[in-house]
């Protein structure tokens, strides 16, 4: 009789012990990030300070050829975006290192060159800008075409300074 009384608790105990064992943790199947896009010869990011305002522009030095323009007032955290476009649009679509954002935009004729200028508002803390800050490149999507704006090594300090100033 004693043995039958012990069998039931032993079975229950071994069942509990089986439930308590840890299964091996699943391994993450994360691919290593690809290499950063190469900077385009003749184009780069340029930082300009004018009083409390900071401007970060991607284009050709000392010219009107600017592809993307970010502006902020010091400490505001608010960005005004201006992007060159071949035709009128309703959004500025940006990507950096897998983070993407679409900003509703106003469109107006460029005046200085053929095409349009799209303007939108954003926040410097948006993930796409924080990734740009870390990686040194951002891409603009227009008509299913990706235009990459990668910094040359010397310009990366200006990108960091811009985001420090903007807050």
List PLM regions with ranges.
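Internal interaction segment
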Residues: 21-22, 100-167
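Post-signal peptide N-terminal segment of mature Sec-exported envelope proteins
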Residues: 28-51
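C-terminal motif of bacterial Sec signal peptides marking the signal peptidase cleavage site
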Residues: 15-18
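Extended low-complexity, serine/threonine- and proline-enriched intrinsically disordered segments
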Residues: 90-102
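Generic recognition of long tandem-repeat/solenoid scaffolds
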Residues: 52-61, 79-83, 116-122
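Bacterial lipoprotein signal-peptidase II cleavage site
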Residues: 20-28
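Short, surface-exposed binding/anchoring microloops in extracellular/periplasmic proteins
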Residues: 59-90
């Amino acid at each position: 009789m004693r043995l039958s009384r012990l069998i039931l608790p032993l079975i229950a105990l071994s069942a509990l012990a089986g439930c308590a064992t840890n299964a091996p943790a699943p391994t993450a199947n994360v691919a290593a990030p690809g290499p950063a896009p190469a900077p385009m010869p003749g184009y780069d990011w340029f930082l300009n300070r004018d009083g409390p305002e900071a401007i970060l522009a991607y284009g050709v030095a000392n010219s009107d050829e600017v592809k993307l323009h970010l502006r902020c007032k010091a400490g505001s955290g608010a960005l005004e975006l201006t992007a060159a476009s071949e035709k009128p649009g309703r959004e500025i679509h940006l990507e950096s290192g897998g983070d993407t954002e679409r900003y509703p935009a106003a469109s107006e004729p460029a005046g200085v060159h053929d095409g349009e200028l799209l303007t939108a508002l954003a926040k410097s803390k948006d993930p796409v800008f924080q990734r740009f800050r870390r990686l040194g490149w951002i891409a603009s999507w227009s008509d299913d075409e990706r235009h990459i704006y990668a910094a040359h090594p010397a310009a990366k300090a200006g990108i960091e300074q811009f985001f420090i100033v903007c807050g």
